[in-house]
Amino acid sequence: MPNILPFVSKSLSFDKEAIRENRRNLKDPDYFRPSGIQTFFGEQGDGKTITLIHFYKKIAKRYPKAIVVSNIILKDRTALKFDGSLDKLKSILSREIDTVSSYIYYSSLEEYALVNQCVRNGKYGVIIITDEYQNYFSNQDSRNVPPWVIHQAAQNRKQKRIHLVTSQDYDQLVKAVRRRSDIAFKCKSFALPFGLSAGPIFTIYWAFIAKKLEFDNNGKRVDGSRPLKMGFFFQSQALRDSYDTNQVVFTGSQADGIYLASQPTVTVKKLAVPLKRRKGVFSR
């Protein structure tokens, strides 16, 4: 018989102070309750990133004291950059941070590790945004995933932290992260008919229990096919303008500005004959 079994018992005793603390937390509007890893997946142009931004804004509005940490350039906030320096990051965290109008920006894998290690906000919470998560930790490289990734993923609730990530295919994410994901959102965007829209403007998303999603070798979903819930929204111009929609996610060492798609690296000669629009199509 295992030596631990004699310690198994049935106890109805409870701590009154623990119950009081739980009640205080429930009544505290600043107490950050969202937690875990929430994944948004879909093909290019299906609206996974804008759906993530849609959710992040709702959470940030509800919890204005939460610190936002993002590898997406958020245009409606001031970026606090530390350029891979632990000392700079600690300097940022040592000062008072305006959580409503600023955010901590990271890009490289090293910077991602530092923000996971250092950024804590107590009961007010942390919102971590990671676009194209498979670029950091892919399922193709599962054996080389550092232990801290698993450690941090397993302790999001304790640290009052929610991690919003995107991936083109859910099964591209490293297995250790998929196992600790809570909800996986399948995203799909559509353009309005009759030439009223030049691109996707209406987005639908389906919420699945992430742990139940299974895929075959071709990436086709074979299990977990019944969504818990479905939602949708129209993409507003304000939502699109709140982040850099052309940004390229790069996780390695980078020269200043090279990998920011919003910064042109070429100069295009002006056309002698401007394009004209005929029946919704531009042509010369």
Description of each model-found segment:
Residues F7, I183, A198-R284:
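Conserved P-loop NTPase motor module
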Residues F40:
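Hydrophobic anchor at the beta1->P-loop junction of P-loop NTPases
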Residues T51, F55:
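Hydrophobic positions on the alpha1 helix immediately C-terminal to the Walker A/P-loop
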Residues K65-A66, K123-I127, Q159-T166:
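Loop/turn-to-beta-strand initiation segments
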